[in-house]
Amino acid sequence: MSAQVILQPSRDKSLRRKHPWVFESAVAELKGRARIGDTVDVFDDEGDWLGRGAYSPHSKIRVRMWTFKKDESIDNGFFLRRLETALALRKRLFDPNKTNAFRWIASESDGLPGVTIDLYDNVAVVQLLSAGGEKHRDKIVWAITKLMPDVHVYERSDVDVRKKEGLEPVTGVLHGQPPTQVTVKENGINIVVDIESGHKTGFYLDQRDSRAAAAHYAKDADVLNCFSYTGTFSCYALSGGAKSVTNVDVSQPALDLAKHHVAINGFDDKRTQYLNKDVFKALREYHEQNKQFDMVILDPPKFVDNKASLNRAARGYKDINMYGIHAVKSGGLLLTFSCSGLMPADLFQKVVADAALDAGRTIKIIARLNQASDHPIIGSYPEGYYLKGLVCEVTDD
């Protein structure tokens, strides 16, 4: 029999709305014994059953809910159903002849809290951020290979958030013989994904729709791609007819791969430049030189790690956007992003607006961009919305 988590009075409302988290402060009592990752049943203070989830004694999120169906066991069949349902949705989203890389499981939004699975052609990269995911690793791999027998599976559970669950970093082969790198297609663009050491699980799949937007706006433009990483925004801009693209990144290996991406997609390397420099420093130098571009892309790393750092992060976003706005020709476009889940969309918009004021310029928002469609947001879990983007016309008016 599973251990039981009893909630404090009046702390059942979020679970009744099917929010997948139970916080430590909501727990009144643990009846029975539960080790890290064990399945527990959750009850309100009057004894009504609310759901079933994974117990994490070291985390402020004490239980991550697997199911709200009383007759649903957390077994092989459970994980198979979750993966099968998620895969069916992804197959509706993409033309496999043009795109063969996507997020298969988006953790809470696909009913598997703390579990991420990204598919890169025939390689599935698994990231387990929760005690429950760790506990059921073998079941998850079994379900992957049941649905895709020819797939190779690699684990990239190497992020700091695992420490909050009392877990150590884990990487390595889980099934088959995955290569170190795999070349995939995204909207017809060839992209090399570094499975073992690339950012996240190897690539920023969540920016697919934003990259397509960049292609749409790039015709005949001189484009500045800041925090360019491996240059996929640049490849999309070139595919959309950009006159030139300048990539700025602090990582020379990333810029080398960006140059390779230009080559394997058949673009003219004479239309590209590569600047190995801190983006803040580069933008300040462009401002001092009065150098401007038709389109500037700002896709910085996450600035907000916790709520306490939000104000500091807002100042960072304001500074980078002010210099980014300086770098846009009058009538040109700024594509700016925040991938910080703790940065509210309205605050991000205010930060960009304040940056424009400080730059002495006017912005007009012409489009909003979000995480790609394979990163869905389930209605009961608004925290799943994390990537915000704005397309702004910049003028001197």
Curated annotation (Swiss-Prot):
GO molecular function annotations of the record: RNA binding; rRNA (cytosine) methyltransferase activity
Documented EC number(s): 2.1.1.191
Record CDD domains: AdoMet_MTases, PUA_RlmI, RlmI_M_like
Catalysed transformations (reactions): cytidine(1962) in 23S rRNA + S-adenosyl-L-methionine = 5-methylcytidine(1962) in 23S rRNA + S-adenosyl-L-homocysteine + H(+)
UniProt xrefs under InterPro entries: PUA (IPR002478), PUA-like_sf (IPR015947), PUA_sf (IPR036974), RLMI (IPR023542), RlmI-like_PUA (IPR041532), SAM-dep_methyl-trfase (IPR019614), SAM-dependent_MTases_sf (IPR029063)
Keyword set includes RNA-binding: yes
GO cellular component, one term: cytoplasm
Known function: Specifically methylates the cytosine at position 1962 (m5C1962) of 23S rRNA.
Identification of the protein by name: Ribosomal RNA large subunit methyltransferase I
Organism annotation: Alteromonas mediterranea (strain DSM 17117 / CIP 110805 / LMG 28347 / Deep ecotype)
Lineage per the UniProt record: Bacteria, Pseudomonadati, Pseudomonadota, Gammaproteobacteria, Alteromonadales
Encoding gene per record: rlmI
